[in-house]
Curated annotation (Swiss-Prot):
Residues 66-144 form the RRM domain. Germline specific. More strongly expressed during oogenesis than during spermatogenesis. During the larval stages, it is more abundant at the distal region than the proximal region of the gonad. In young adult hermaphrodites, it is expressed at a very low level in the distal mitotic region of the gonad, and begins to accumulate in the meiotic transition zone. Highly expressed in the proximal pachytene region. Not expressed in mature oocytes. Not expressed in the spermatheca. Weakly or not expressed in the germline of adult males. Keywords: Developmental protein, Differentiation, Oogenesis, RNA-binding, Translation regulation. This is DAZ protein 1. CDD domains: RRM_DAZL_BOULE. The keyword Glycoprotein does not apply. Belongs to the RRM DAZ family. InterPro entries: DAZ_BOULE_RRM, DAZ_dom, Nucleotide-bd_a/b_plait_sf, RBD_domain_sf, RRM_dom. Residues 1-29, 195-304, 406-499 are annotated as: Disordered. RNA-binding protein that plays a central role in oogenesis, but not for spermatogenesis. Required for meiotic entry and germline differentiation, at the pachytene stage of meiosis I of female germline regardless of the sex of the soma. May act by regulating translation of specific mRNAs, possibly by binding to their 3'-UTR. Residues 214-236 form the DAZ domain. Gene3D superfamilies: 3.30.70.330. GO terms for molecular function: mRNA 3'-UTR binding; translation activator activity.
Length: 499
């Protein structure tokens, strides 16, 4: 048996041996990884080769087209005949070619072909003032043609501080010479900077690129099949498509660049036909349910004169102007059934109450209870029967009060409404500001002549009789006896004379 010191020594050795093994394994793993620099480098690290030779292919070779010049800057409304007549002032013109858009509109530049190269060179040496056309200075330049197209299908452009080489998909191309040019119609930056951006890709190229992404890395062969980049000048947002667009003085908004459509892949849902079938079936079922509900509503409305009646559900929706709903029927003290209304009660289960739908009590006069003369609205006295009517009726004679549009112990002698206990006439208060006149003033007002200022004479005999005076001083006429009437007529027919 080991002593404690020896056991401690052995444990220390085993622990040190394990640490050495782990350090050796870590050292072997670190040897495969790149060493981390102790300090940051003072010079920038080049991510791509110098000159970007692997990304930007060499420009193709161009040749100068003899006897032909580039002309730009003329109005877009100019025709080929007008352009030919203008240049025939100097030399004979063999051919005129104007560049047009897809809709047939001129882009403001074209090509003029002369008989010889010397004639074309002489025209290029002329000043813009000598070539002025319609008060515009024309821009001239050489016409070039691309010799080799390499394996790159789309065109590209490369700009450096010394020159600009631009290619276009057409048969003609244009270039700005590196040496100072005598033409002052177009000015470009003195020291432009070169920026390389990947060009727009069409639908076929996007599909080809997605297929190439399956390879682990791009080989030089694959790089050759990729589209070449386009070049932008500093401060410009649109690519320089061609030298012709720049020399012609056309604004960027007028130049219509090529449109590339990019179609993103759409995921295909599983069992798409099944989903469409289920959706169509659900839609048809929903439409049929809606039509069935509309038909039921139309049938119920046509069967009754009231708003939105439904005889099959046991309740009716409240009228838009009535904040109550029917909750059932009840029997009053006279043994007659009535509809029971409550304030917005929920619908009851079918069959809980007898399905008896009727209008409120103030609408049942003309439809259900025409025999009762005082059930509902009384047009003679402009009064309502029931809780909304005159409550004094119930206080004066409770037995004759209408309860729920049915009379209780109502006698036949009150059918005409002459009894003050049945229907009371509404009291009319006098109008404010109305002047109360005396009977004499009223009589004077009636006897006035329609002519202003004139006054009719009343017979003096009528005022002398006591009955006439009595009628004058009183508002209501007095019924005379036969004797008084005969005496009054005798006095009027034979007046007394004063001697």
């Amino acid at each position: 048996m080991m002593s404690p010191p020896l056991r401690y020594q052995k444990d220390q050795q085993n622990q040190q041996h394990q640490q050495n093994q782990s350090q050796q394994a870590a050292h072997q793993m670190v040897s495969f990884m790149p060493q981390t620099p102790t300090s940051l480098p003072s010079t920038p690290i080049q991510l791509y080769p110098t000159g970007a030779a692997a990304l930007i292919p060499a420009p193709p070779t161009y040749e100068l087209i003899p006897n032909r010049i580039f002309v730009g800057g003329f109005p877009t409304s100019t025709t080929e005949t007008e352009l030919r007549e203008h240049f025939e002032k100097f030399f004979a013109v063999k051919d005129v070619k104007m560049v047009k858009s897809l809709d047939g509109q001129s882009k403001g530049y074209g090509f003029i072909t002369f008989e010889t190269e010397d004639q074309a060179e002489e025209i290029r040496k002329l000043t813009p003032k000598q070539l002025e056309f319609r008060s515009r200075k024309l821009n001239l330049g050489p016409a070039i043609r691309k010799i080799n197209s390499n394996s790159f299908q789309p065109s590209y452009a490369i700009a450096t501080p010394s020159q600009l080489v631009a290619a276009s998909p057409g048969p003609f191309s244009y270039a700005i010479p590196a040496s100072p040019s005598p033409y002052s119609g177009y000015s470009y930056p003195a020291s432009p900077q070169m920026f390389v951006y990947p060009p727009l890709r069409s639908q076929d190229q996007s599909r080809q690129q997605s297929e190439q992404q399956t390879t682990p890395q791009n080989s030089p062969t694959n790089l050759q099949h990729q589209q070449s980049p386009q070049v932008f000048f500093g401060g410009d947002q649109d690519p320089i498509r061609s030298y012709a667009s720049a020399v012609a003085g056309v604004e960027k908004s007028e130049v219509s660049p090529e449109k590339h459509e990019s179609v993103s892949p759409q995921p295909l849902l599983p069992n798409q036909n099944v989903l469409n079938t289920q959706y169509s079936q659900g839609q048809q079922q929903w439409n049929s349910n809606v039509q069935q509900q509309q038909q039921q509503q139309m049938d119920s409305n046509n069967g009754g004169p009231y708003y939105n009646e439904n005889y099959s559900q046991g309740y009716t929706r409240p009228h838009p102007y009535q904040q109550f709903a029917q909750s059932g029927v009840y029997m009053n003290s006279q043994g007659m059934y009535h509809s029971s209304y409550s304030y917005m009660t929920p619908p009851l289960a079918p069959g809980q109450y007898p399905q008896m739908m009727s209008a409120p009590y103030w609408q049942q006069q003309q439809q259900h209870h025409q025999s009762h003369a005082y059930a509902g609205y009384n047009p003679a006295y402009n009064n309502w029967v029931g809780p909304s009517g005159d409550m004094n009726q119930f206080k004066q004679n409770p037995s004759n009060y209408f309860y729920q549009n049915y009379p209780g112990n109502f006698s036949q002698q009150h059918t005409m409404g002459n009894n003050e206990n049945t229907f009371s006439l509404p009291l009319q208060a006098p109008r404010q500001g109305k002047k109360s006149r005396k009977p004499s003033e009223c009589q004077d007002k009636k006897t006035k002549s329609p002519i202003k200022g004139a006054r009719t004479e009343r017979p003096s005999s009528s005022a002398s009789t006591p009955d006439a005076k009595y009628q004058k001083n009183h508002r209501y006429p007095v019924h005379l006896s036969p004797l008084s009437a005969s005496l009054q007529s005798l006095a009027i027919s034979s007046p007394t004379k004063n001697n």
